[in-house]
Amino acid sequence: MKNITNYYVEDKSKLISNKDAYIVGKKFRITVLSHRLVRIEYSEKGLFEDRPTSLIINRSFPKIDYFITESDSMIEINTGVFTLTYVKDSPIKSGILSSNIKAVINGTKKEWQINNPEVRNLRGINYSIDSVKDKIVLDKGLYSLDGFCLLDDSRSLVLDENDMFIERDKDIKDLYLFMYDNDFEGCLSDYFTLTGYPSMIPRYALGAWWYKNNNYKEEEIKELVDRFNHDNIPISIFLLGDYWHDQNNGYTPSINLKNISNYLNSNNIKLGVTINPKYEIKEGSNDYQLISNYIKANKFSFIPFSNDKIGLYFNLFINNLESMGVNIFSIDYNNPLDRINLWKLDHYHYGKKVISNQRGLILTRNSGIAPHRYPIIWSGKTLVNWTTLNLLPRYNLQGYNIGVSYIAHPIGGYKGGIEEDELYLRYMQFACFSPIFLLASEGGKYYKREPWKWSPTIEKNIEYYMNLRYKLIPYLYSESYNYHITGHGIVKPFYYDYPKIIDEPTYKNQYFFGRDFFVAPITEKKNTIINRVMKKVFIPNGIWFDFLQGKKFIGDKSYNNFYRDEDYPVFVKAGAIIPQNTNIKEEIPTTLEVLVYPLSDGEYSLYEDDGFSNNYKNGLYMITKFNYHYEEDNYTFKISKENGRNLVSTRSYLIRFKNIKNITEVTINDKNIKYNYYYDKDDFIVEVKNLLIGRNLEINIKGKDSLVSSVSLVNEEIKEILYDINITTKLKEQIDKVLFSDIDVRKKRIAIRKLKRKGLDSKYIKIFINLLEYIQKI
């Protein structure tokens, strides 16, 4: 079994590149790893590094062809993608630009030199956004508009032959140069090959987390969970903050964690606690009595977190907490100037789970060292306000630039500010379509993270979105597996596919959510005149459907949309297949609802396993394949088992064909399969009961003029806006007559403006002009 230090190095032979990749001089070694990636080492002593570092765990890339041109003093390497030149054995120093080593992307003017400031780098994420009020100073990312990025591994810790992390010689340079031009997906692939692919998180981590920093009594925890259950609002993780122990007595609980864990587990909830190893263990405390058997001092701290303290930390304290039922540790070591010790804490805590055949899971700020290997990144104790909410989507997208998808934000904001119902609801909706859903705040009864503390209308909306989150977990978990295997992030910035809008602030927060969703989060207050948010959204290329309302949008253009409190700008592409839970308490669903969107062919692979162990690596998983073939008024849907073992023996399906009507014929490939079909509003449902796993299903549906028009949906939306707006009924009737007339849009605009003479205020005229634009585009 691997130990807690070196668990992340799966095969030490992969630390060495293939022999044809090396070009070696007296003081330099260049390793051509891929067509986009080269390693550059410089050492005055001619000593080069083959051991793992805190960042790098694999240097064995597939062999590639490249070309070398060499003289006594110069070397030129052409990979086909870029050309690197180097003055042999010349020093590679930090500081000013130098042309002794440089690289050019072939066929372009994009040139890198040592110490290039990389001003067009789009940055990654920083340590945290604790208390940030506006702008964020971000760390460097991999993605640059110049198409190159330098990763400096010179100061990383090295894992020595005794499995100890040690510092490196300060007189060396160890650089990884990515020259990818426009192929950022290829850059990420190389980065993950080098540093390890993203970790697979437990399934329960995709549910809702509860973290309110109250001084809870055992009975208060039970009452809180009972209330969540009573209101049909699910949670999966209960995280205790500062008060589960006396902070002067760091690791001895002041409440009965075993009882709490047993109760939470009976409700399918995991227990987590917050720890901060910087707290000193002082003479006279219970913890000191344990430590004093090994170390003699009147006080003791685990920071700096050294190799010789690891055993004491885990064997005396962490193991004890785990025996009481603690599943998750939130590492609250908040010191941006000491990321090395934070990384060590992350590395060892995560590794302790892995060597026990469990999936690691921690909550931690960003150490900056391969954070994708140590989920989940905690953005910190953020402020409660609209400015913070507006920062969060973009922060998630910055994570994509360094390969990180799992970022947890305190939903609702953590501290300060004003508790506003509209703000809280928009936080919750954003969380529903984020990788991690963490309800968190400082302690105190006036921080209203409990949904029932809000008005009945807001609570109803919160309940809807929290339950929707759980319904989407089959989709989210499959996307998590895809991220783990391929490195394709769960959230992807919109500007990757549309670089022309990268500097357009209106669209900066838009993102893809998995392969089939597109989200344009609401981060501003609504227009009180119409009681709706007026939001401009740029829809991607293709055909998309509003996930909640069903309206169809033609892509590659912008729309001025209108959103009530209960609405949210989430879109699903044509041909998408979205698997959903019907019973949110089931880990492996016995019944699935599958949403199928028209106007394009589609496919989806549903991934499932036990949700917590690493047995999936040994084949204990199941992949179900869904296929959809679309022709006008003729639809074929197939279900087949693609791979893995049977985790359930049978499964029932409720297959919801979206926006379909006027069906004339339904056939299924096997007459022995029992099925039923019916309409539900604008959807057509086919139900199949107890289908044997491994048994293929094929459904064919035929109809006439079967696609539901978006016009009727838009018309109803306009009528609702007219109902809500605060003007005279007579003016409403006149506006209705104009909007729903057969005259062209230009004449409608003129007619609306003329209503000013009859008392229609300019602010309303502007709104209805926007509505006309919306109608025209739809």
Model-predicted segments: where are they?
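N-terminal accessory segment at the very beginning of proteins
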Residues: 1-205, 210-213, 218-220, 225-226, ...
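Catalytic-domain carbohydrate-binding cleft regions of carbohydrate-active enzymes
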Residues: 2-7, 84, 96-567, 735, ...
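A broadly conserved detector of short glycine/acidic/proline-rich loop/turn motifs that flank catalytic sites
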Residues: 27, 36, 44, 81, ...
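Solvent-exposed beta-strand/loop surfaces of large extracellular or lumenal domains
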Residues: 52-65, 546-565, 665-688
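A surface-exposed beta-strand-loop module
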Residues: 74-76, 80-83, 676-698, 706
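Catalytic cores of secreted or luminal carbohydrate-active enzymes
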Residues: 467-486, 540-624
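Generic detector of short, aliphatic-rich beta-strand segments that form the cores of beta-sheets
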Residues: 568-572, 695-703
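Accessory, solvent-exposed terminal regions and/or long lumenal/extracellular loops of proteins
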Residues: 575-671, 680-681, 691, 701-778
